[in-house]
């Protein structure tokens, strides 16, 4: 289990200058050839996303104005706060900020032939499945995960194991991304 606070994470600038990324976790760790990866991105200007052949991307707007995504296959989609959207990482996708407002997004990327991600908003206590990886990012409220208290802009990631996230206040929300391995793959077989 790894815990994070985005206010304390290192920032990497994008090559095109239109944003920056804070990597939450990568599996296997410390490799460019990841099976799955989670990050927080800040989009500061209009431009194309980097290509990731063979990768599915799930992007969720956390803060800022809406973002219009346009793909070369004639799809358009407007990112709205806390509503995950999935698209192919090997497609050219351009992001246009509404009214020029910077946005902050949670990004989950999975190698299409190894695993998949499902991202959803949780607003009550829940327990994860034991054989799946996951990432949580607290939007609001106070949450207990093991012996750790998590509040806004904090979270955790894991590669497997059963974990209970307990909401400690009457209201709160977090984003939960569950990573499911495809048949024939497990965290032990892909390292």
UniProtKB/Swiss-Prot annotation:
It holds the Pfam family HutD. CDD domains: cupin_HutD_N. InterPro entries: RmlC-like_jellyroll (IPR014710), RmlC_Cupin_sf (IPR011051), Uncharacterised_HutD/Ves (IPR010282), Uncharacterised_Ves (IPR023482). It comes from the Bacteria. Belongs to the Ves family. This is Protein Ves. It comes from Citrobacter koseri (strain ATCC BAA-895 / CDC 4225-83 / SGSC4696).
